[in-house]
């Protein structure tokens, strides 16, 4: 599984980024490394930005340099720290290649939220060796400005709570009406 405390998620990991696997959790992309804690490796983990009410990587923009990501493989728990963040085009596979001498995990999801894949939000994590990482700005393609998905996510939460409130109100009214008719 993968655990990201800053995002409040713990997701099962599946091998292969198929639609079925990504509906169930996060997926290790094909032709990338497995999370075994070895140098010259990059395990690219993809997840939806949110799917059927389950957050998956919805809150990925909360991650900053130095934040912790934990991977539990069948043999051990591996700890990684966020090193840098980029926004890339979906077909820019050069951005997720193995980097010499590094043990990496790269998180990948669509950006902006609910965009259906216009861009990719990429979080590069390196094996935690106890070093402190400097804060970095999010790097983007050709200095293109990308709006944060924070407000879109907040709006979605408000709509959900408002809908719940309306349902509760009408449910209470229905109970009151049925009691008046019955009693």
PLM features per residue range, with description:
Residues 1-158, 173-179:
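Solvent-exposed, non-transmembrane regions of membrane-associated and secreted proteins
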């Amino acid at each position: 599984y993968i655990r990201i405390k800053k995002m409040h998620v713990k997701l099962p990991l599946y091998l292969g980024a198929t639609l079925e696997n990504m509906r169930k959790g996060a997926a290790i992309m094909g032709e990338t490394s497995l999370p075994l804690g070895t140098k010259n490796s990059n395990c690219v983990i993809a997840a939806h930005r949110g799917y059927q009410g389950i957050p998956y990587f919805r809150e990925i923009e909360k991650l900053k340099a130095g934040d912790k990501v934990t991977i539990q493989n069948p043999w051990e728990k591996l700890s990684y720290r966020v090193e840098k963040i980029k926004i890339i085009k979906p077909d820019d596979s050069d951005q997720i290649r193995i980097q010499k001498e590094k043990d990496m995990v790269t998180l990948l999801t669509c950006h902006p939220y609910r965009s259906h894949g216009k861009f990719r939000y990429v979080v590069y994590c390196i094996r935690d060796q106890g070093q402190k990482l400097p804060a970095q700005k999010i790097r983007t393609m050709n200095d293109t400005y990308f709006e944060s998905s924070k407000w879109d996510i907040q709006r979605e939460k408000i709509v959900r709570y408002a809908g719940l409130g309306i349902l509760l109100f009408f449910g209470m009214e229905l109970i009151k009406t049925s009691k008046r008719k019955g009693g």
